[in-house]
Amino acid sequence: MLENPHVTETEALLVAKVPVTTPRDKIHEVMGPAISEVYAMVLEQGRSPVGPWFTHHLRVDPAVFDFEACVPVDQPVAAAGRVVPGDWPATRVARAIYQGPYEGLGEAWGAFKAWVAAQGLTGRDDLYERYLVGPESTTDGTQFRTELNQPLV
């Protein structure tokens, strides 16, 4: 389920992002449009994505998703519509790869957080997921690859 859990330091990034707060059962309705909106604005402003898109979950809440849909970019973007610019600082994180359908992410996060705790590490309240292989690449959910990142205190 989880591949290669380890601790690493991320690089600082410029991002274009759309903040989203939605009930958990509506995530499938809002995720795609949010990412499409970010990519459209990035391209409209003549910027280029410089890596996979990701979601920065600001907090974990059983009732809602409170996150930012982010695209790393080569140059800053101007705020337009719901899209805002952001800086993603270099951060020490615990990281692992989950391979499988998105429906298994909750269980994967549980196993990953248990690994983090077993290492004597303390995670912050936020977390993020980078989508390395998803529905834009294959219709086979067992082939999806999601990078799990737990920023550390």
Feature roles, as predicted:
Residues 1-153:
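A solvent-exposed interaction/effector surface
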